[in-house]
Amino acid sequence: MSSIVVVGTQWGDEGKGKITDFLAEQADVIARFSGGNNAGHTIKFGGETYKLHLVPSGIFYKEKLAVIGNGVVVDPVALLKELDALNERGISTDNLRISNRAQVILPYHIKQDEYEEERRGDNKIGTTKKGIGPAYVDKAQRIGIRVADLLDKETFEKLLKDNIEYKGAYFEGMFGKACPTFEEIFETYYAAGQRLAQFVTDTAKVLDDAFVADEKVLFEGAQGVMLDIDHGTYPFVTSSNPVAGNVTVGGGVGPTFVSKVIGVCKAYTSRVGDGPFPTELFDEDGHHIREVGREYGTTTGRPRRVGWFDSVVLRHSRRASGITDLSINSIDVLTGLKEVKICTAYELDGKEITEYPANLKDLQRCKPIFETLPGWTEDVTGCRSLEELPNNARRYLERISELCDVKISIFSVGPDRNQTNLLKSLW
């Protein structure tokens, strides 16, 4: 039995999809365990580029299972659009499995997300407005509708009517706006559920069977540790737990099944949306990173905020997710910069701190303490080992590893699969 969890160590968009796809070649099952279609990842497969939001990266390997676990919130209509788009491009989706215990995103969740952001005004969280947060709220309130409920017409009808009554009063009282009606939702979403029924099963049993058969299971994380609702920059976080430990809850497997945790990061830092970002850049170096790195959100298209690498963040992520190995992406983006910087600690009210503050006010007063290293101008996109990298680029990666106390097992020097380099076997 062997399993690997891939998690983002920053604020998402670290390149987890690419690393998952890379590791998926040797896996038997690839499973998602948290988030929803707010997560976007770009995959290059067979010379083509695909942008996925809900579908696991393993979908491209027809002999492997691609699992959407119970911890994922599923918009049935959005998922069908994604599946149809893949089918139109000749990709079979017969290997998809969807948990019957996953929560369903409905139109009132999306509207609630939109209205909540409007209500917050300048204090908005910066959500993708996909209904993720409200769906998780309903789950916690025990009024959520699960995939198993969606497939049963009588159950779905009753639960939906009850929720529409409740949401109608809530929308009117909180926003002064109407809730989507039963008639606008029922037939469309029931039909969507029927189309998805062929994929629905008890995915926890699927994963357990894989472990019993000594198969290799790859868990695909969404977002990043710094967006975790418990361990991230609260309240500027997602509504779920992207940390590796959530595999046990969102995947439905025991903690003893996890063998390794791969922490994925960029050679710099990026963030979409609002919230603290101590190493954020607003100068020419920031412009260089954004444009060369094509830093625009897969889901939203919004320009990402960019900054220098923050080892305080990565050390926090290492502890929160039990990271055993590091994958550093987008090293090529820094090529051409005269100097590169790594944040080693923060200064808070005249004192040096090396731990990430929980208090938002403290965090806003933190000033990054940088270590400056010489940059490089040599082309790194063809490098296949650490030894082939320019001396300054190699020293930069080694310094990150030293500061974060995690060994580098993968490094990437470009967007293509053959630009991802494995330094040791992870399976």
Curated annotation (Swiss-Prot):
Keyword annotations: Cytoplasm, GTP-binding, Ligase, Magnesium, Metal-binding, Nucleotide-binding, Purine biosynthesis
Cofactor note: Binds 1 Mg(2+) ion per subunit.
Catalytic site: 13 (proton acceptor), 41 (proton donor)
Keyword Metal-binding part of the UniProt annotation: yes
Highest taxon above the source species: Bacteria
Disulphides: none
Pathway in which this enzyme or protein is active: Purine metabolism; AMP biosynthesis via de novo pathway; AMP from IMP: step 1/2
GO molecular function, one term: GTP binding
Location(s), subcellular: Cytoplasm
Binding site for IMP: 13-16, 38-41, 128, 142, 223, 238, 302
Cofactor field: Mg(2+)
UniProt keyword tRNA-binding, yes or no: no
Gene Ontology BP annotations: 'de novo' AMP biosynthetic process; IMP metabolic process
Binding annotation for substrate: 298-304
Residue ranges of coiled coil: none
UniProt: Mg(2+) binding residues: 13, 40
Catalytic activity: IMP + L-aspartate + GTP = N(6)-(1,2-dicarboxyethyl)-AMP + GDP + phosphate + 2 H(+)
InterPro entries found in the cross-reference section: Adenylosuccin_syn_GTP-bd, Adenylosuccin_syn_Lys_AS, Adenylosuccinate_synth_dom1, Adenylosuccinate_synth_dom2, Adenylosuccinate_synth_dom3, Adenylosuccinate_synthetase, P-loop_NTPase
Quaternary structure, from the entry: Homodimer.
Family as reported in the entry's similarity comment: Belongs to the adenylosuccinate synthetase family.
Function: Plays an important role in the de novo pathway of purine nucleotide biosynthesis. Catalyzes the first committed step in the biosynthesis of AMP from IMP.
NCBIfam families linked: PRK01117.1, purA
Protein name, UniProt field: Adenylosuccinate synthetase
